[in-house]
Amino acid sequence: MDDYNKAVLGGIVKIASKMGISTIQSYQSSQIFEAVGISKDVIDKYFTGTVSRVGGIGLEDIQADVEALHNAAFDPLGLDINMQLEDGGAHKFRSGKEEHLFNPQTIHLFQKACFTGDYDTFKQFTHTVDNMGQNGVHLRSLLDFSYAPDGGIPLDEVEPVSSIVKRFKAAAMSYGALSSEAHETIAIALNRLGGRSNTGEGGEPEERYHSESNSKIKQVASARFGVTSKYLVSAEEIQIKLAQGAKPGEGGNLPGAKVYPWIAKTRHSTTGVGLISPPPHHDIYSIEDLAELIYDLKNANRHANINVKLVSEAGVGTIAAGVAKGGAQVILVSGYDGGTGAAPRNSIKDAGLPWELGIAETHQTLILNGLRTRVRIESDSKLLSGRDVAISCMLGAEEFGFGTSLLMTMGCVMMRVCNLDTCPMGICTQNPELRKHFHGKPEYIINYLTFVAQELREYMAKLGIRTIDELVGRTDLLHVKSAPADSRMSKMDLDCILHNPAIVNSNVHFQKEDTYDFHLEDTLDMKVLMKKFKLSSKTPQSVKLDVSNTDRAFGAIFGSEITRKYGSDLPDDVYTVHCTGAGGQSFGAFIPKGLTLELTGDCNDYMGKGLSGGKLVVRPPEGITFKPEENIIIGNVALYGATSGKAFVSGVAGERFCVRNSGAVAVVEGVGDHGCEYMTGGTVVVLGQTGKNFAAGMTGGIAYVLDENWDFYQRVNKETVSLEPVEHKYDVATLKELIREHVELTGSPRGKEILDDFSEFLPKFKKVLPYDYDHMLRVIASMEERGLDGEQAQIEAFYAVQKNK
């Protein structure tokens, strides 16, 4: 019973965490579940109020299933012969057990087709997966096409393969989850086709930005790994990952054993030290916050489309409407079947919903709100065949993502060890020895996606449809398959999926002329900075101007142009902007090295978001009567995801200061709750009080905190960090120099007071140091003492630490 209680409690805590629920009172009656495949009678009586949109089985079917499972588990005579339960094949394929789209037979057919370029073998594969299971394996298995009675149109009148494949994308799979060989192979293949690959949330090595292996879609997830100005300007599309189909509501956790030196470099973290992704984006707590991030990223790269990734769930249409109003140009609705092999099993099996429900709801809701022509809808999650793509398009999608299937083309054999770094095919591993086994080629992926487009064209010809745009939303060309009256299929009701609210025109899709206008030409960046600064000159220049809190993402556009021209090669302070007034949201977001923003006044939330080498200085106006160190001068979530650069703030910051900082240096005179949360690098100096939960999830970097009242230990989260006195000469010199620079730039009275009596204040400082980070730095230092250079020392230190675990 103790084990059972522990398991049940763990399950409740896990689900509450996914849903952002903190207390059991909020969990009770929250109705956060949706039923799929259960009849209305059962729902109304036993799960009153729970959403169940497609009907399904009744009590008699549930009873039959329970009895079958019981009989399989227990001897009919009650003898304790073998009490071990059989593996039902839910996770790994087992012959005669649960159906899997990829099983030994289908894997063989699929890989033979891709490796040899044999379209006939591919047709055998799609025939098998499209007709799998007595009752089907997807909601789309219950649908069929209503072909044109006149036989359709000639195939050569249908949109060509070369055009269709430009709508194909590689689903987001991170460099870190995939080996560099696999990640680059996917990017090269999609680039050659004219489609787009996706970096995933792990960043991308800079050397790939302007090569054939550049991923055209750059993802921005909650951890902001590798999100720099250079990363963003190299994109044709920027995707905001709000959730992941296979594990919605969960943040990632990359164990230290998988943070190889090259992964740490790309993610701006420390070799061998675990990385924690926050479950939410800490700059998104409302649809308005999401609109702000969309705006910020559009400023960071004016030429990129902004894509928002959602997960199929009840109400996703309402969220999508808000996303469309917020300016997104693409909305991805991801289904539960998308597959990170590293997700927990309960997430893989029991979280998220079929994309058929999400795509249909999103398409319908956008039509009803007059927003459908503003955005493209994208679907992904186990799209395998031309039939899958056709149905997805007919339910409302215009672009299509492929994930698991691309791994299969490169040799994946479904060992289900993606999370263990032991992939025998060199696909989902960073182990150099296992990566030698990688035999994937871009040509295999090109063969597969060409086959899908070719098969899609065949369906379109039979339907009498000439272009993809003509096919979007055409649910009138779908019907539910007939089924025996007593079968489970017959109990399903797919009317909600097939409903088309477009009364006048059944074919409503994206129209370029209706795209959201951000009015970037009206920003101060475009009207002032781009005109007054000579971008062609590296001679130090400065501009003075007034700002107000309506000037959002100030500096981001000009910063992006600096990055395009110079990368990160400029010295500090080449372009300096002296601002007066109230800085708007995301002041100085993503600004690169060479750009300095000095603000005399105060600043709103998200200051220095994604700081990429630039410098920020905030100070109160002269002649103030209050003490800066006792008053808030910048808002919440400053320096979120900063990767490099400096920030000096003469005053107090709001909550979540430097959350996910991975390389910036900051000096501030007080912070709110959750300071330095999930930090993985950089240095933070706090010359005053902190709020509670300081350093929660912090796995890298160093913080120096002034603890005048000797009570800081009560407000720090000591799960991953230690508190130490500042005694080492390097620490003392670093701290003193940063305070000196802070005083020089801001004129801080508090900083000057500390410097004038530094020996008195020094014992009151605490050094916040993550355990794993400290250990790894010591091992690296010992390797360098043996004569190894920096990179080789990191590699040897990584293997030494893993060997001793």
For each predicted feature, which ranges?
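Long, distal/terminal scaffolding or interaction modules
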Residues: 434-435, 446, 459-463, 472-475, ...
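Generic, well-ordered alpha-helical scaffold segments in large soluble proteins
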Residues: 7, 11-18, 27-30, 46, ...
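Flexible, glycine/charged-enriched surface loops at secondary-structure junctions
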Residues: 15-26, 198-202, 301-309, 372, ...
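Mobile "lid/hinge" segments at catalytic clefts and subdomain interfaces of large enzymes
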Residues: 8, 29, 34, 234, ...
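Alpha/beta enzyme core
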Residues: 13, 24-25, 38-46, 227, ...
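Hydrophobic alpha-helical scaffolding
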Residues: 1-6, 14-17, 96-100, 112-115, ...
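Flexible, glycine-rich loop/tail regions that form catalytic "lids" or insertion modules at the edges
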Residues: 1-229, 235-237, 241-248, 257, ...
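Conserved active-site and cofactor/substrate-binding residues in soluble primary-metabolism enzymes
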Residues: 3, 7, 19-22, 120, ...
